[in-house]
Amino acid sequence: SVGFKAGVKDYKLTYYTPDYVTKDTDILAAFRVTPQPGVPPEEAGAAVAAESSTGTWTTVWTDGLTSLDRYKGRCYNIEPVAGEENQYICYVAYPLDLFEEGSVTNMFTSIVGNAFGFKALRALRLEDLRIPSAYVKTFQGPPHGIQVERDKLNKYGRPLLGCTIKPKLGLSAKNYGRAVYECLRGGLDFTKDDENVNSQPFMRWRDRFLFCAEAIFKSQAETGEIKGHYLNATAGTCEEMIKRAVFARELGVPIVMHDYLTGGFTANTSLAHYCRDNGLLLHIHRAMHAVIDRQKNHGMHFRVLAKALRMSGGDHIHAGTVVGKLEGERDITLGFVDLLRDDFIEKDRSRGIYFTQDWVSLPGVLPVASGGIHVWHMPALTEIFGDDSVLQFGGGTLGHPWGNAPGAVANRVALEACVQARNEGRDLAREGNEIIREASKWSPELAAACEVWKEIKFQFEAMDTL
């Protein structure tokens, strides 16, 4: 019987295609699927493929007006997750035609849209995406990338140093600018607006921008080094955000900042385009990421958010610290750090990388290590992240007993000591504490910092097994 047959049929009849050979132009997704009891994994995987592409809950007359074979998502492989009784990794291939060019927003609306509320699934998590070269090429990506940033700043062969200004809320613009100046004068490369500093009653954005610019230029003149402060342009509307970025450019400062998840991908991509056109670097904070990536079984892994940011655009992004965390997390963090920085990343399941990713020369993003780190962590951070990173010490600078500038000196001395030791062939993993102790002999600022944070231990043995 030719023609339209109404009724509800199993998704797996149309959307589960184990024989499908993936195309180079397909977007590939790895989902961690936890079906409701009694729902077979093939049906669950097919349901995800259907709901995130062309399907709906019943057959519809209009299906006959298009070629589903050309446009449907396909669940092409299912693997049980080791150690979990009812959980599977379902691989889905999406034809490229389903997505608008150059739009992370559209990509996510499809892939992580309705399917996540689907009743037949207990939970659903997107673990990784393979972005085909053909789609990557529709994105501008980071405004400048790692090499251009180094050339702009004239800083080579070491990680960059930053510091988030605290207390994050409540300082007046002038006192805020003073804190920025002290840190930069002491030897940091960057200071940072906290992610929640936008434009509040105690400090309006324009006043902050002016005082921070003054701090930047004064400290540059004194130190002979290029300095920057991440001026947070995040705002309630895209127009206001761009207005703030324009003012930053008029002041002649080198870098602005955006909260890309709360601000949204559309706003972020607009800002990234503005930054490239106007020579501004763009620092990205990931506020709200844990709402999306914290649950093991539901949501989206941060590596997907990191890939999306590289497509949308940003020159720096916060990426965790690794230090003192568990071993597995270290490998997985380094996995998405490589996805941010490198041009080509091989599939490696032990590091959470489900697909080989070729970025076809899209500029790289500097990972930012921030949160709870201090001078004793410096050898570990230098070893783990290497030169292409930004190490941010908020409390680890401002908590110095003698003040911000000595705190900055302590961090810079510790970093330079670690880089020199590494370049001389010493083993940072084994000799880290010794290297810091030696350096503190000729730097009273570092000695004072070592004293304050000496009680805070961290696990360093694990490094040897990497």
From Swiss-Prot:
Its EC number is 4.1.1.39. It is found in: Plastid, Chloroplast. Its main location: plastid. One of its GO terms (cellular component) is chloroplast. It catalyses: 2 (2R)-3-phosphoglycerate + 2 H(+) = D-ribulose 1,5-bisphosphate + CO2 + H2O; D-ribulose 1,5-bisphosphate + O2 = 2-phosphoglycolate + (2R)-3-phosphoglycerate + 2 H(+). Heterohexadecamer of 8 large chains and 8 small chains; disulfide-linked. The disulfide link is formed within the large subunit homodimers. This is Ribulose bisphosphate carboxylase large chain. It comes from Aesculus pavia (Red buckeye). The gene is rbcL.
